[in-house]
From Swiss-Prot:
The keyword Lyase does not apply. This is Deoxynucleoside triphosphate triphosphohydrolase sahd-1. The lineage of its organism: Eukaryota, Metazoa, Ecdysozoa, Nematoda, Chromadorea. Coiled coil: none annotated. Transmembrane segments: none annotated.
Length: 587
């Protein structure tokens, strides 16, 4: 390896590659501040279509060569999206490699630019391992398995919980432990603490106490004492709190996991977003650790000049959810796939650690059994010789997907979650949106029956089969909070603060009012019908009209009254800022 070559992931465009060389991230083995470090020179160099190459040092390569990690090759990153966007066939394997490369580069940059942080070799490796293994707990078809399938199966399974179990299994293998012990801890106690930190970097939420009522109003000394008392992380102390902003940032969502999948999924689907490779490069050029003005903890911050670049992360997430992840055809095919998995779930068996067989429905009860499941479950169902009616029904559902016998979108409307006030507290989550779908579907049936009688349609409208569905399009946090509101910034350039302890700040209220929507989440309610309705435009139009009337009747959708010459887009655009200012002023 050329010792003069910087060790960091290179973005695949030539211009950005050239500019990235200015980051001055030195090769780990040549760092003057860590002369006693074990050499972490790349063991493998893997081609990557987003970053050009991903360089994997020893002993990280040993984790990649485990059966648990290799399983990710057989899990598509975006589930069934490839059925609409054919190039989205990339796997959790490549996403995990990309997330690792960003995490390593970010922590290594902070280590060189801010030696006072005392980032150790163990800190770097723990963060890198957490990034590499953060998705090993995903089931078949990724989020479909721990989403709608788990819900209909009556399970509370979350892939993060399974990831923790699998990580512990991997890291405690004798051959893995012997490779990592010299870095993570020679004694069993030290090693176990490091493994705990790895899992906490994925699932830990060390900053939740900041949301306690009145926390920000406490005197500084009381807040400092509260932080010490509320720090619930076992793997490290509050002095390394900034590490929890890297892989899985539960506070604002601006982490390398999201950065990688936004770039990778956008590139694969061909759907453009505002977050780009040059945005990533700019952020890495302006990152540093500062003091959180609210908690006094050390947090990752960016120059205030990058506020638009950070805002693009949440906005791009919503864009991809709208156009890619929750595409209407994808959502309909997901319903068919879940039908198939539920019906075939009792017949598909996987051997667990004790030799016992677990069905697909309870496979999450045993780690070894779970690790035998992949996206290949679809072929297991299609190739099954079982003649039980449920298995035949499952095969029929999958054949509908293959033959493209799926519904077509007849109409939709967007709604503000706040309009679902009558749902008694369920309006700000998936449950609330599902309740809206239920109410709208019932109302549509009534309206279509009335239309059928009024227009003398001879029962055609009454007999129409349709499905009302929903999409929750968020920016990564709750319905009202834009992630940028919870991001810490600093003034100037990183070089201006070398050797100094900087107190950061949050975006001003004026910026939030003028640049962020009042609601960070929107719901899309849409109706899918048989494709034959495309040949019956009159019937399709009536279904679309019924959806609109049902939304207005249930007060989920506000009826619009305007003169013919009014442009609804212009009216909405001109009034939105003033309306938001009034609402903030009255609060």
């Amino acid at each position: 390896m050329d010792s003069g070559q910087p060790w960091f992931p290179k973005i695949h465009t030539k211009e950005v590659r050239r500019r990235l060389s200015s980051l001055n991230i030195a090769t780990p083995s040549s760092s003057p501040c860590n002369m006693n470090w074990q050499s972490l020179e790349p063991k493998h160099i893997i081609n990557d279509n987003v970053y050009g190459t991903v360089k994997v040092p020893r002993p990280i390569d040993k984790l990649i060569d485990t059966v648990e990690f290799q399983r990710l090759r057989h899990l598509k990153q975006t589930g069934l999206v490839y059925l609409v966007y054919p190039n989205c066939e990339h796997s959790r394997f490549v996403h995990s490699l990309g997330t690792f490369s960003l995490a390593y580069a970010l922590v290594d940059k902070l280590r060189h630019s801010q030696p006072s942080l005392n980032i150790t070799e163990s800190d770097l490796i723990c963060t890198s391992v957490a990034a590499l293994l953060h998705d090993v707990g995903h089931g078949p078809f990724s989020h479909l398995f721990d989403g709608e399938f788990a819900k209909r199966n009556g399970s509370r399974f979350k892939h993060e919980d399974m990831s923790i179990l699998i990580i512990k299994k991997i890291m405690n293998k004798p051959e893995i432990k012997s490779e990592f012990a010299c870095i993570l801890g020679e004694t069993d106690e030290e090693y176990a603490k490091s493994v705990t930190l790895i899992t906490e970097l994925i699932s830990g939420k060390p900053f939740d106490f900041q949301d306690m009522d009145g926390f920000k109003d406490l005197p500084a000394d009381v807040r400092e004492e509260t932080v010490k008392n509320e720090w619930a992380i076992i793997g490290c102390g509050p002095e390394k709190s900034f590490l929890f902003d890297v892989v899985s940032n539960s506070y604002n969502g601006h982490d390398v996991d999201k950065m990688d999948y936004l770039l990778r999924d956008s590139k694969a689907s061909g759907v453009g977003i505002t977050f780009s490779e040059s945005t990533l490069e700019r952020l890495f050029n302006h990152v540093r650790v500062v003091i959180d003005p609210n908690s006094g903890l050390k947090r990752i911050a960016y120059s205030i000049k990058c506020i638009g670049d950070l805002k693009a992360i949440g906005d791009s997430r919503q864009e991809l959810h709208s156009k890619v992840y929750q595409h209407k055809a994808v959502r309909f095919m997901e319903t068919l796939m879940v039908d198939a998995l539920i019906n075939a779930g009792d017949f598909l068996k996987y051997k667990g650690s004790n030799g016992e067989l677990y069905s697909l429905k309870n496979v999450t009860e045993d780690v070894d059994a779970f690790l035998k499941t992949t996206d290949y479950v679809e072929q297991e169902i299609l190739n099954s010789q079982i003649t039980d009616p449920k298995m035949i029904e499952a095969q029929t559902a999958l054949l509908k997907i293959q033959r493209r016998e799926i519904g077509c979108k007849l109409g939709y409307f967007e709604m503000n979650p706040e309009n679902a006030t009558q749902l008694k507290g369920n309006c700000n989550n998936q449950t609330g949106a599902a309740e809206v779908v239920k109410k709208v579907g019932q109302k549509m049936k009534e309206i279509l029956e009335q239309m059928d009688d009024t227009e003398e349609m001879d029962g055609k409208l009454k007999d129409i089969q349709f499905t009302v569905m929903h999409s929750v399009l968020g920016r990564g946090l709750d319905d009202k909070t834009h992630p940028i509101e919870r991001q810490i910034f600093y003034d100037g350039k990183p070089s201006e603060h070398e050797g100094k302890q900087v107190v950061g700040f949050y975006p001003s209220e004026d910026y939030v009012i003028n640049n962020c929507p009042r609601m960070a989440t929107k719901w899309e309610i849409f109706v899918m019908g048989d494709r034959s309705l495309r040949k019956e435009p009159l019937l399709a139009d009536r279904v679309k009209r019924a959806l609109q009337l049902a939304g207005e009747s249930e007060k989920f959708l506000t009826p619009r009254k305007r003169s013919p010459q009014d442009s609804p887009d212009e009216v909405s655009s001109s009034c939105s800022t003033a309306k938001r200012r009034l609402e903030f002023g009255s609060s």
